[in-house]
Amino acid sequence: MSRRKARETAFKVVFQVDQVQADAKKAFDYLVLHDKLAEKNQGFSWDLIQGTLEKQAEIDQMIASYSREWALDRMSSVDRNIMRVAAYEILYLEDSQAVVAIDEAIEIAKKYGDEGSGSFVNAILDKILGEKNG
């Protein structure tokens, strides 16, 4: 559960940056205190945030290529930002287990998204993992 909280915090920060151009570090610092993110998971969460924001253009291209029915700017901002964080973890974090990252993203999507969010996020992330694995 602790890494889920770290992933959830990363999603919340990336979402805030996307929606209101929030300062990522300030948003992260606030959420660490507000959500009581354990110190041992703060580094992981911050790595997800920084990496996602740094690689966002590449990640967005990949998400867009697999979501043909939904343009990136037309899809739910919750779904979009959950997928960004999970895609970063799948593609760029060597010590990450992709299947776990996808499962966690689905659970976060069910919590914050709408009825179809979990399925949509799962479908796109499965395609991204498939491309990575060739």
From Swiss-Prot:
GO molecular function: RNA binding
Gene3D superfamilies: NusB-like (1.10.940.10)
UniProt record, GO biological process: DNA-templated transcription termination; transcription antitermination
Keywords tagged on the record: RNA-binding, Transcription, Transcription antitermination, Transcription regulation
One Gene Ontology CC term in the entry: cytosol
HAMAP family attached to this UniProt entry: NusB
Protein name: Transcription antitermination protein NusB
